[in-house]
């Protein structure tokens, strides 16, 4: 007997329109139900000229399941944190698998159009 494919949660949080990560501002410039494209610009002067666009990130829409974590140490030991199901913004380990970086908008749009 084969394994059942896990289905995506029926309700989940969407990707944010803007997101700050590692001193960069990410702005969603286009998306479908399958793929999104974000413009990456400098937000922290330690990374260069604030506002300068440095790259475009294209990635498949991946939905992470809801989960809970229990604080194991410190003053809040035993506290439970609940995280809802949500569309996942890629981490470093996801690039080359379901996320890609491009230095021009045209190249990013080409990948976006191939995936949508």
PLM feature segments, named:
Residues 2-87:
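Short N-terminal "domain-start" leader segments
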Residues 90-110:
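A short, exposed loop/beta-hairpin motif centered on an aromatic-Gly-Thr core
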Residues 114-116:
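Short arginine-rich
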